[in-house]
Amino acid sequence: MTRIGTPLSPSATRVMLLGAGELGKEVIIALQRLGVEVIAVDRYENAPGHQVAHRAHVIPMTDASALRELVLREKPDLIVPEIEAIATDELARIEAEGIARVIPTARATQLTMNREGIRRLAAEELGLQTSRYAFADSLESLTAAIDGGIGYPCIIKPVMSSSGKGQSLVADASELTRAWDYARSAGRVDQGRVIVEAVVEFDFEITLLTVRSRGGDGNIRTDFCAPVGHRQVKGDYVESWQPQPMSETALDTAREMAAAVTGALGGQGLFGVEFFVRGDEVWFSEVSPRPHDTGLVTLATQWQSEFELHARAILGLPVDTRLRNPGASAVIYGGVEAQGVAFENVDQALAVPGTDIRLFGKPEAFERRRMGVAVAHGDDIEDCRARAREAAGRVRVVV
């Protein structure tokens, strides 16, 4: 039986989010609707999640002592990492000492904080099909890996980054030094190690939102949302849609792979598992033990969004992954470099039939920073995509 207390009282059920961006903000709102007291933590002030949490803190989350001090002060029941750049070894110690439970598990946060840990788990331990890959910690070893079998074209990424930061598509050797320097500059913690991957010729990419929750019999069960298709530019998600049409054979394979990798990570919560698909063939790409940016589309498509599913699963509550209707999402970019921007033409954006928007409230805009998202629902995927893009395009960011 799940027991939830009263926020801001001695009986409160307390959840601490490490990372308070736009995805964390939606998780906070979902938790608060269930009566949870939420503490939001990020590395900068006035992050989106700070604006809606019961309490907000700013600390360097890679600082183990600062992280421990805050956890001991706030005494959360659950710690929910929403980003990769965290002192995960300290989280493991906190969990081992019984101070708080880490979602989904401390081990999962350690493995998924960098691409090396999760790729070795998926490909080498679980035997999942992936692209050819290698790891390198110098330009010389990177060159040797490419010449030794990865080949051109290839993709180079920092082992630790997110949202496409530091990612390059390299066509030939003349572009290698630039890609190496870019990857090193964008890595969040370990700035000297990269993964290089062979390019997979795929038809489309999907995110399979996978939920591990506790069923009525007390055992962990695994449920899947309808596949989310998405389009990326330079590693950044720019639009997504649900459901992505695909063969039953490919979908069954993706579900089997997702169940295997999330089962190996353990714990409860929602995972974003990414795949490349060509015909009936499926390649595992990445997994995040938290809601996924491409899953913002579920705000318009599912009975319970990915954020509500995550909140319910971590609290031990029943989940419903059913699709309500097709839909799509499109990103609203900053377009400027400025603080405290304003958004014009919001009325015009919302005049597009069957659409809604979310403005994230980020304190600073960058040219390619995601400042909001438009979502559309309907009966036809392509029509939903067109309306989401239209609504997003009508919003104007001004200084």
Curated annotation (Swiss-Prot):
Residues the record lists as binding Mg(2+): E274, E286
Domain ATP-grasp: 120-315
SUPFAM superfamilies: Glutathione synthetase ATP-binding domain-like, PreATP-grasp domain, Rudiment single hybrid motif
Pfam family, one: RS_preATP-grasp-like
Keywords for this protein: ATP-binding, Ligase, Magnesium, Metal-binding, Nucleotide-binding, Purine biosynthesis
PROSITE patterns named among the record's database cross-references: ATP_GRASP
Xref: Gene3D superfamilies: 3.40.50.20, ATP-grasp fold, A domain, ATP-grasp fold, B domain
Gene Ontology BP, a term: 'de novo' IMP biosynthetic process
Primary enzyme class: ligase
Gene Ontology cellular-component annotations: cytosol
Record: residues binding N(1)-(5-phospho-beta-D-ribosyl)glycinamide: E22, L23, E82, D293, K362, R369, R370
Binding site for ATP: R115, K157, S162, S163, G164, K165, G166, Q167, E197, A198, V199, V200, E205
InterPro entries linked: ATP-grasp, ATP-grasp_carboxylate-amine, ATP_grasp_subdomain_1, PreATP-grasp_dom_sf, PurT, PurT/PurK_preATP-grasp, PurT_C, Rudment_hybrid_motif
GO MF assignments: ATP binding; magnesium ion binding; phosphoribosylglycinamide formyltransferase 2 activity; phosphoribosylglycinamide formyltransferase activity
Transmembrane segments: none
EC number: 6.3.1.21
Pathway recorded for this protein: Purine metabolism; IMP biosynthesis via de novo pathway; N(2)-formyl-N(1)-(5-phospho-D-ribosyl)glycinamide from N(1)-(5-phospho-D-ribosyl)glycinamide (formate route): step 1/1
Catalytic reactions of this protein: N(1)-(5-phospho-beta-D-ribosyl)glycinamide + formate + ATP = N(2)-formyl-N(1)-(5-phospho-beta-D-ribosyl)glycinamide + ADP + phosphate + H(+)
Family membership noted in the UniProt record: Belongs to the PurK/PurT family.
Function: Involved in the de novo purine biosynthesis. Catalyzes the transfer of formate to 5-phospho-ribosyl-glycinamide (GAR), producing 5-phospho-ribosyl-N-formylglycinamide (FGAR). Formate is provided by PurU via hydrolysis of 10-formyl-tetrahydrofolate.
NCBIfam families in the cross-refs: PRK09288.1 (NF006766), purT (TIGR01142)
HAMAP family: PurT
Subunit comment: Homodimer.
Protein name: Formate-dependent phosphoribosylglycinamide formyltransferase
Species assigned in the record: Thioalkalivibrio sulfidiphilus (strain HL-EbGR7)
Top-level taxonomy: Bacteria, Pseudomonadati, Pseudomonadota, Gammaproteobacteria, Chromatiales
